[in-house]
Regions:
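Long, low-complexity intrinsically disordered regions
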Residues: 1-272, 277-340
Length: 340
């Protein structure tokens, strides 16, 4: 079994995440290529597409949201993701029974499924949904997260298109997006296949970390995806991968890239050293679920960035090598111009 080095895994991940070179893609194919973007903070998805897509414009994403070609919804790990409409139905079916929602929450959500589907045809706030549940169905609930996640999944409630705009409204509203419910296994086959195409080669623990699925629920999906390629990492752990997925050379050059808050590149593996050294991990991913905006130098997270008075400010973890200083400045200037 071939052993892949850390740098080989790094280059493979960056290639699949469209971070070796920007590609000329429209929004929907780009989202499907990278298995969606984490989207708790809507502007992050715009920066995430800008750093991956050649010529990306904000209007392109806003148009895709308005046309419901792109959907912002609770999916993997119970977090908000921006995905294509096609992937929304399959991803939602795959993770709805992932085990992280208490059975009683799912049962309660199923009881009001038909009613919430009808009620959700018009955009509603969370407060409006819970008031309606009390008034119309006598369900007095404290608004716990488990029930709210279950309600959105069982009722197919997604963030209304305007909640994903660059300038978000103050009150998030939710609306029904129709999709055909798919059996768990074919949905998980699709989900795991998307993950490997976007983040592989990967261990089973990596797939579980990103998807929120238990390893025992991942195994049948891997069986259905056979034949798969198998490798080992430098610690001897088995990696699985799709047969024709790219594996760039270790000496493949990597341009400087700026990643937004919550970017899945730093979140989608159990072992995140393929993109971020352990010594910097707590600086990037810390309390309250915050994931900072970062920049990559030679393919690895080298520091943080923020916008201050209209300027992009970089905070490297260590002094940048001389050869990388100008490329970092140039990419920061490009991002600054785009944000303006």
């Amino acid at each position: 079994m071939r052993t892949l080095t850390l740098r080989e895994l790094n280059r493979a991940t960056l290639a699949r995440q469209l971070l070796l070179e920007r590609r000329r893609l429209s929004v929907v194919p780009a989202l499907e290529r990278v298995a969606g973007l984490q989207a708790q903070w809507a502007p992050a998805t715009y920066v995430g597409l800008w750093t991956r897509v050649d010529g990306f414009r904000r209007e392109a994403l806003e148009r895709a949201l308005t046309r419901e070609q792109a959907v912002r919804a609770v999916l993997m790990r119970g977090t908000v993701h921006l995905v294509s409409r096609r992937d929304y139905g399959l991803f939602g079916s795959a993770v709805a029974q992932a085990g992280w929602i208490r059975p009683e929450s799912l049962e309660l959500a199923e009881q009001v499924h038909d009613a919430i589907v009808e009620y959700g045809r018009e955009p509603r706030t969370k407060a409006e949904v819970f008031a309606w549940l009390l008034d119309e169905h006598g369900i007095d609930h404290d608004g716990g997260l488990g029930f709210w996640y279950a309600l959105r999944m069982a009722g197919r409630l997604t963030h209304a298109p305007e909640s994903g705009m660059w300038k978000q409204p103050r009150d998030t509203r939710f609306v029904l997006i129709e999709h055909e419910l798919v059996d768990a296994l074919p949905a998980r086959v699709h989900l795991v296949g998307r993950y490997l195409a976007a983040f592989g080669p990967a261990t089973r623990a990596d797939i579980s970390e990103w998807s929120g699925l238990r390893v025992r629920d991942i195994e049948p999906a891997l069986d259905a995806l056979e034949p798969l390629r198998r490798f080992a990492d430098e610690r001897g752990r088995e990696l699985v991968d799709l047969p024709r997925a790219p594996l760039p050379s270790v000496d493949t050059p990597v341009p400087v890239r700026f990643l937004p808050r919550f970017d899945n590149v730093v979140l989608s593996h159990a072992d995140r050293t393929r993109v971020i050294a352990d010594e910097y991990r707590s600086t990037v991913i810390h309390g309250g679920g915050m994931v900072e905006a970062t920049f990559l130098v030679d393919g690895f997270v080298a520091g943080l960035w923020r916008v201050e008075k209209g300027r992009v400010r970089v905070e490297p973890f260590a002094p940048l090598p001389r050869a990388w200083r100008r490329p970092v400045e140039d990419e920061a200037s490009r991002l600054e111009a785009w944000l303006a």
